[in-house]
Design a protein with these regions (language model features):
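Short, C-terminally biased terminal segments at protein or domain edges
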Residues: 1-46, 50-117
Length: 117
């Protein structure tokens, strides 16, 4: 089931975001962008999990739409961190790819829930 894949991948992604946040704050002394990244990057899975326990398909769909927006915001913070030289190309490419994969899964799931195959 796609939702369980989303839950697994979003949790794994959140753990990567937490590690990146620690690195940015401890090693790079960056506190503003990293805090935004931490908030949005961990919120993806939280919203997916909340939706999985909603009362209806509409609840799940609504939470997945929020997760989708958080995913897009996370991409933005990652781009800024890369373009401002806080993270290097390999770090950026790796975590950004995971973020894009999550986005694809969430978009596909919301389309399926809405019957827009």
């Amino acid at each position: 089931m796609t939702e369980s894949i989303i839950l697994k991948k979003s949790k794994s992604f959140a753990l990567r975001i937490i590690k990146l946040y620690k690195y940015l704050t401890e090693e790079k002394k960056e506190f503003v962008l990293s805090k935004q990244l931490l908030r949005s990057g961990t919120s993806i899975g939280a919203n997916a999990k909340e939706g999985a326990y909603g009362q209806s398909k509409a609840d799940l769909c609504a939470r997945l739409f929020v997760a989708q927006k958080e995913c897009a915001e996370t991409e933005y913070w990652l781009e800024l961190l890369y373009e401002s030289n806080y993270i290097n190309q390999p770090e950026f490419d790796s975590i950004y790819k995971d973020c894009q994969e999550l986005m694809r899964l969430i978009v596909a799931s919301t389309k399926t829930l809405q019957g827009k195959n």
